[in-house]
Amino acid sequence: MESSRLFTLGLGNSDDGLKSTFGDKTVTCFYCNKKKEKIRDGTSTWTCSICEATNHIDEKGDILDYRPPTPTQDKGVGPFYAIRDFPSSSSFQSPFCEKCQMNQLIVNRMLADYLPDSSHPDYQAYEKALPEYKKSIEEKFPIVCSECYDSVQDQLDANDYEAKNQVLGYWLQKSKEQLNAKVPHHYPKASFVLWLLRGFGFSFFYLQSIVWHLYHSMIISLLPDGIRNLFLKAISYFLLDGSSSKIFYFNWLGFFVVFWNPYWYKMMDNPSWELFGRDQYIQCQALYLIIRLTCLYLLSCYESEILNLSSDTNLESDFLLRQIHAAFFFVTICFTWISISCLKPSPPPEVHLTGEILKPRKKRQESTSSVHRIGKESSDRKDGISGQNKLQQFATISILNNTNATSHLGNQSVRERAPEESPMTFLQKKMAALPTSSPVRPMLKPTLQLQNSPLSKLVPQEVGNKVNDSIHTTSNQPSKFSLNPSISLKGDNVIEKNLPFSVSTLKSTAKKDTGKAGDGQNREIQNEPVSLESHFSKSLALQNDPTEVIQVKNVLHRNRRNAKLLIAFTILFLVGLICGWRLNRFTMFIYYLCILVLATYYVMKHNFYPLRKVA
């Protein structure tokens, strides 16, 4: 009876499976250090609820470096049972051959050993040259050969198909739900009525501003008598006979209506639509309202002085005032058009199932500088060393997880369907595409020398000595070991580029092939470096841009030219108006400002449209 009470109160033995309310302690996970758990005394193992890591502690509560013991095999032979074999996830067949895996291992090791410590004085120079260095070693050691290209591409296509299948299924399900569901009107009637009233106030505000400036400007005198009589009849509706001081106080009401959204009703009926340009619309409205209030305040203060100035200069009493109203008439129209055109409602993207015919895939040509051809090429030389056997000594680990390689191929497989071209061929095409007016200099034959290459850490000592001395190849073959060497172009202007392998500028000249095989002297042969195209691109201002970007740049150039022509013709037109209407400098400045705003809007609108289309 007494023992049952103890068990009921939770004071019994903890080994009987009953949780005790006493003896609990709070511990912190050793791995995430964020979650505190309550465990009972005597517990040596517990699992964190956040990171799901298993913590092992000793009797004092200190963390233990726990390693599960290896299971011991029983000496006795137990009964044998037939067990069905299930395919494991680790039985994935890699689409890469041993050659690709070895190249991937070389690339990964060279990239890992490239950057020095952050405390190194030339760390920024190394980091800046990292993209060129990575590109050069990927050209020397291609991570995907021509034999594996099809299988890797098929695997990527299968992955893309699965991803597209999931995305397409989601869009189809979502579009089906949108078609079947009825979109309710979430806004009350009071909001709709208020939106209509603000729209009426917005229209009346801008219409009154435009008509008021038109009525008091010199343009009204050029209109026919019938239209002039219509303006006289509309005086009582648009406050056309009001002075500048009255209109100034009236324009303060514009803060309640100028920020009206004309697409609010459409966006509420179509929740899936998006409205772009809302911020630019509000900024343009606020800027116009501030400019208008400032100008009206100045007109109301100095209206009498302007009239006196007109009489002193033997002009009509209100001639200057009419010019100012004419200028603000065009400015108001300009700001109204620009502000409303900033708003762009955009429907959701549509999904169409179209039968697209893919072009036949071409095999990518294998680079002649592959690691497996080094031995074959160097064996033809009398003083060459078999690079294949040397490089295979440190490439013994096979890459099973090819995430870097597959991601690299996934980024370039879409663009590089065509066979690869040599750097010089690609450079010649770019130079042929340059305009005739561009200051293109004839290509000079550079000379190169390599010192302290990071490849020397991986290549055996015998090959490394050859690399550090001077390694040159023929002009028809890319350099095997010289990755991003320092280049000095000798001509009218000397261009020196310091690259990370030797921070100081390396200057060397090509020597004639005077050595013989086995005489202990290093042979130096003139060559064209691997990264020659990139260095000529910098000196000639060439850019490796895709076709879409080049088209966009052409559109930008054309629009800027048209805008300049528009401004020039408009200025000539205003110069002609000076002789006829005797415009003063202030009115001329207002007209020019209005034209400049229109031209800027034209350029910005037509420039960003192709950029959004390409993106």
From Swiss-Prot:
Pfam families: Ima1_N. One of its GO terms (cellular component) is chromosome, centromeric core domain. Residues 357-387 are annotated as: Disordered. It is a multi-pass membrane protein. Inner nuclear membrane protein that specifically binds to heterochromatic regions and promotes the tethering of centromeric DNA to the SUN-KASH complex. Couples centromeres to the nuclear envelope, thus contributing to their association with the microtubule organizing center attachment site and to the positioning of the nucleus at the cell center by microtubules. The chain crosses the membrane at residues 192-212, 247-267, 323-343, 563-583, 586-606. This is Integral inner nuclear membrane protein ima1. The lineage of its organism: Eukaryota, Fungi, Dikarya, Ascomycota, Taphrinomycotina. Keywords: Membrane, Nucleus, Transmembrane, Transmembrane helix. InterPro entries: Ima1, Ima1_N.
